[in-house]
């Protein structure tokens, strides 16, 4: 193996009440892809923020291209040849793709004016490399979340960096977009670029990475080549124990029909009908753009319905806003927890109780003691790792933020809980905890809708599965009669009946 182009040795970083990094180390080699693995809260993102100068380090050393380095901030590290593609996109919806890619370093003519034709041409070349079909003159806001992620990647490529850090780069990508990204990674690897690949998707690690570094509780656990381990060994390194069963589904006797949807049509949704019983988990599968999230938002009241009937406990409802949906007993946990679900500048307590203040109030007075008791109960029940209920939620790991988002929905004591991509960006240990919580609510008779892009998750946790394509339901299966091939056939628009299956 070549000499490392980047070495982080025994890095330490502490925040009030938390030691985020405790002698964490990472080596990045030219022409190789290094997976950085660990549970949420293991210190992966903190280590990258120390590297790029967002956080100062308390101890340890950074060596880049054989020289000791300490970057003053992201611009400094970027100019030195280290780019980071964050899990949360740093883009402006109101600007064009090209303007986003070259923001702050626009291509100019000899007279100091922006050379628009040249800038669009360079941006179009980058988009072509990533197989993005849009013109760089397109406004970013017109793109899907997955396409916006590809623009973020194009922006990093424009720096011709020697080290590129990708933090959960495929979280919002379709299979086609993911394969395009992998082609670019292979191309960059051939050019001698060192890549740090942060992901919880074990399949991707074994497909695209050469080496693996594992962190746990801020500590360096080990480094190995991908060919030297397997999924079980990697999980054990990450969580410090064996996970016996990935999807711990339980069988519960279902009760009466709780939710009935008849001929529902709305934004991106066409003539959808289904039922949901008490104590049942209904999985919703489909490819990106199939209309799954839109369907949930119409049911919840976040998007308008044009026609159709929604019956909840034999009573027709017509939610016209999220507040209306909550008041009727429907809680929706968004796929975009940082955009729709949480207020990052508020505390754990404030976020968790935000939607339940009416239930925690007498008249206009919030019963703060009741609020504290309820929040503390959820922190304990969900095993949320936080120094206190007053901790700013933006400082928590992704897995713990997701647990708070789910608790926030449950604080309203809903009849129907809609979970949209509940384990996106969450590590294997936190996933298992979330699955166990879902089972607990199921056993208590709650009706749950589980929307997920991960087919094994839908198959593993659901009792019954609906598949969507272009806003319509193209398949319905009992989970025990379904498999990935049947779900994928329906997801691309092929009608598959359970009898034929």
Swiss-Prot record:
Subunit details: The complex is composed of an ATP-binding protein (RbsA), two transmembrane proteins (RbsC) and a solute-binding protein (RbsB).
Annotated ranges, domain ABC transporter: 6-242, 253-495
Keywords: ATP-binding, Cell inner membrane, Cell membrane, Membrane, Nucleotide-binding, Repeat, Sugar transport, Translocase, Transport
Catalytic activity: D-ribose(out) + ATP + H2O = D-ribose(in) + ADP + phosphate + H(+)
Pfam families (alphabetical): ABC_tran
EC number: 7.5.2.7
Keyword GTP-binding: no
SMART domains reported in the protein's UniProt record: AAA (SM00382)
Recorded GO MF terms: ABC-type D-ribose transporter activity; ATP binding; ATP hydrolysis activity
Residue numbers binding ATP: 38-45
Family matches, as InterPro entries: AAA+_ATPase, ABC_carbohydrate_import_ATPase, ABC_transporter-like_ATP-bd, ABC_transporter-like_CS, P-loop_NTPase
Repeat in keyword set: yes
Name listed for the protein in its UniProt record: Ribose import ATP-binding protein RbsA
Membrane topology per record: Peripheral membrane protein
Family the entry assigns: Belongs to the ABC transporter superfamily. Ribose importer (TC 3.A.1.2.1) family.
Residues annotated as transmembrane: none
One GO term describing the cellular component: plasma membrane
Gene transcribed to yield this protein: rbsA
Cellular localization per UniProt: Cell inner membrane
Coiled coil region boundaries: none
Functional summary from the UniProt entry: Part of the ABC transporter complex RbsABC involved in ribose import. Responsible for energy coupling to the transport system.
